């Protein structure tokens, strides 16, 4: 199969994977930032911080969302060091974050040995306006490479700004789910027929995008409920892509 999905702690799972097995790391780690104060950021659950009214239904919580900024930076450095070992020379990394964690995320990715390349923006057209303030309608994507990039391997021209709304209603399967249309553009940084790793896979949107764009996918998700959702979405995408007669899934 062109995808594998692992349920468990990302650091432990990545430790068992071989060197140089992926071309791109594209992931959306817990931001550990929602809330106006440090107390709110470390005491409230992910569901309390991030569930928006357009979700339309209750969504299960996820873990890893209650670190202070120093602890978050330490964890991110650890896991991105391990991810660099798995990434081929010239491979890339894309990490979602918000404005509060932008600095610590760029610090951590460089401390892990990656070459910081820049910041992309994801614009959310339906973000709620705030009276007397600027609308917080962007999240950010830090991108980096494992050493120099050989552009001849993947001669693409990709934009630095992406605009799409978060899925709403019953299409929202995860509290912080990213739009597949954005992820489909981002996975194109991975060479054709390459492999994308997402160690915070959530409901599997990165994997769905990778399969739709002809890339292989390795996903890791700690929460069992979301692992099951991701498995269903990846399997359905694979069947739609290959055709039912070409897809045989092991139990």
Which residues fall in each region the model found?
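S-adenosyl-L-methionine-dependent nucleic acid methyltransferase catalytic domains
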Residues: 1-126, 132, 136, 143, ...
